[in-house]
């Protein structure tokens, strides 16, 4: 998992040749912290096929307006420069362990769907 800043956002996310899953978070958000370990495990599972990243909205508040982020954690998927907010389930189900399997299912069915055909 990489840390994205406004300085490297364009290069790391928008210009990426591989799909990116970006978590918008803040240091004081316990749910965001819980997703860090999920993102690390997902990165290990999928390797170089996907880029998992996080951006701290406290350090980069401008990003909230750019992507119309209302709260954290928010997860967006970027493919070929296009952004889509991930329609993940509401807490607490998502954060009680269900989240990791949901993200794997999403990655497999939406991001790598052509690889399975």
PLM features per residue range, with description:
Residues 2-5, 24, 36-43, 47-62:
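Thiol-based oxidoreductase modules, predominantly thioredoxin-like and allied folds used
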Residues 29-32:
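Short cysteine clusters
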């Amino acid at each position: 998992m990489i840390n994205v800043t406004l300085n490297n956002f364009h290069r790391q996310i928008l210009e990426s040749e591989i799909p990116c899953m970006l978590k918008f978070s803040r240091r004081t958000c316990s749910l965001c912290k819980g997703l860090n370990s999920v993102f690390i495990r997902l990165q290990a599972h999928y390797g170089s096929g996907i880029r998992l990243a996080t951006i701290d909205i406290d350090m980069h508040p401008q990003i909230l307006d750019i992507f119309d982020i209302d709260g954290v954690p928010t997860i967006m998927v970027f493919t070929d420069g296009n952004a889509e907010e991930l329609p993940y389930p509401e807490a607490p189900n998502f954060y009680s362990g269900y989240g990791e399997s949901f993200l794997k299912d999403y990655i497999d069915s939406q991001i790598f769907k052509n690889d399975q055909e």
